[in-house]
């Protein structure tokens, strides 16, 4: 976990629990998993979306329902349940200039009054993964840095080429020459184009 600066070595400690829209009526998230007592939810956004915490409430509700059912937990009993801690990260790589990190809160969506306090909160940490942002994170996760380089390269070629397909193709060639995402781009070239 680069964000928390933790390194998990045992793959058996990882339980992927990504929501698929087949079961949840068009509700899916990019990736979610349990590891180290944390329910991790990761989303990718190419546009700024201040409503991510509301989506997070929906996702976490479903994820915790699944967790309770899978572990045969009694939500009606007198014993307090022990649940994994939720962590919600949104990776942003849109063209609008945003800070390296931003906290998005569900409570910011509520119709506010001075004397009322919400009984519900969900916080998403939005991390800007555009090239040049979050240098420490990029240094710790080379693959993410290479992705940021590739996206920047595509955007540069979009200024020069007539079609998106040409821009992506030239960006792929340039990145492969520079040893950026080389294995992925060679293997998935047809899918990327």
Task: Briefly describe each language-model feature range.
Residues 1-193:
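Elongated, amphipathic alpha-helical interaction scaffolds
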